[in-house]
């Protein structure tokens, strides 16, 4: 256990000789991290790190592997900030990354900041395995915090894989915001919660080049909307120097599995495609709850409804009053 109750823990690969290994494989198992002066650096955390703020930096060619606990939570104030940076980041099964605060959730930035903004080093590979908990919730008062799992969307090799549990909840404030973004995204089995018990729901943002809503994605999105978490899928269009291959980086959103929503809480579903939105299966909103659902479909190209791709609303509609 490494603790610094009132200060900050900063781990850099150059200074953490006991935490440095010689090689690390990329998620594709086809490439390895680029060497830095002949050495591929790996920062590994298997224990507990506890401080007000924690930074783990493996450098632009290094990697971070964490299977332990990283904690900047506070029992009496707003939680702190966690930054984990490197070329490749792997948060392994059983890990706990916590920024829970009595007066507001903190920030957990893995592989980059929100939408890649700021000066934080951007990862090429960011992985959060199943049975991992990342939590930036508010535990008493205040808003939920911010969680970002990011890999550089401008890099054609960029992959973000998130299969664990992400929370940025609130009790009486607003829910927090959660982003899972990269050129290619895998969110199979992910669990997300940015809801609020008494306040406004938060946001889950998904930002790849292309995105397909299949069985797993539909279940996850449906659960978040029904719990009061807003979901926004924003695709970008690749340049000629970006993604290549048969799938392309066109900026399309495809709905292959239907979404059946009950409206238990107010929420908004936004599909914002740089190119086309294709509905091969529908979106149905049933009148079984007291909440309100807002739908926003925005496309730079076409919105196509194929057979079975209807939008059905079985809900009371009230006209505005003068």
Located regions from the model:
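Extracellular and secretory-pathway beta-repeat/beta-biased strand scaffolds
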Residues: 1-322
């Amino acid at each position: 256990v490494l603790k610094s109750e009132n200060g900050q823990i900063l781990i850099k690969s150059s200074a953490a000789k006991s935490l440095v290994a010689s090689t690390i494989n990329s998620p594709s198992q086809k490439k390895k991290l680029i060497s830095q002066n002949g050495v591929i650096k790996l920062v590994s955390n298997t224990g507990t790190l506890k401080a007000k703020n924690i930074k783990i930096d493996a450098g632009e060619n290094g990697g971070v592997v964490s299977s332990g606990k990283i904690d900047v939570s506070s029992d009496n104030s707003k939680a702190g900030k966690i930054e984990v940076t490197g070329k490749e980041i792997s948060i392994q099964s059983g890990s706990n990354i916590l920024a829970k605060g009595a007066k507001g959730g903190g920030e957990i930035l893995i592989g980059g900041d929100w939408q890649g903004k700021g000066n934080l080093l951007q990862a090429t590979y960011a992985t959060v395995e199943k049975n991992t908990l990342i939590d930036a919730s508010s535990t008493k008062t205040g808003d939920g915090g911010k969680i970002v799992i990011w890999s550089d969307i401008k890099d054609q090799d960029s992959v973000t894989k998130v299969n664990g549990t992400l929370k940025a909840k609130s009790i009486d404030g607003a829910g927090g915001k959660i982003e899972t973004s990269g050129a290619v995204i895998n969110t199979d089995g992910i669990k997300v919660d940015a809801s609020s018990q008494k306040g406004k729901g938060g946001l889950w943002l998904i930002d790849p080049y292309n995105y397909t809503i299949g069985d797993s994605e539909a279940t996850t999105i449906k659960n978040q909307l029904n719990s009061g978490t807003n979901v926004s899928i924003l695709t970008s269009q690749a340049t000629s120097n970006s993604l290549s291959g048969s799938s392309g980086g066109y900026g399309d959103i495809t709905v292959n599995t239907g979404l059946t929503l009950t409206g238990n809480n107010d929420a908004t579903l936004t599909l914002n495609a740089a190119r086309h939105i294709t509905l091969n299966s529908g979106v149905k909103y049933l009148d079984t709850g007291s909440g309100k659902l807002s739908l926003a479909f925005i496309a730079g190209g076409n919105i196509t409804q194929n057979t079975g791709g209807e939008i059905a609303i079985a809900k009371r509609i009230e006209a505005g009053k003068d």
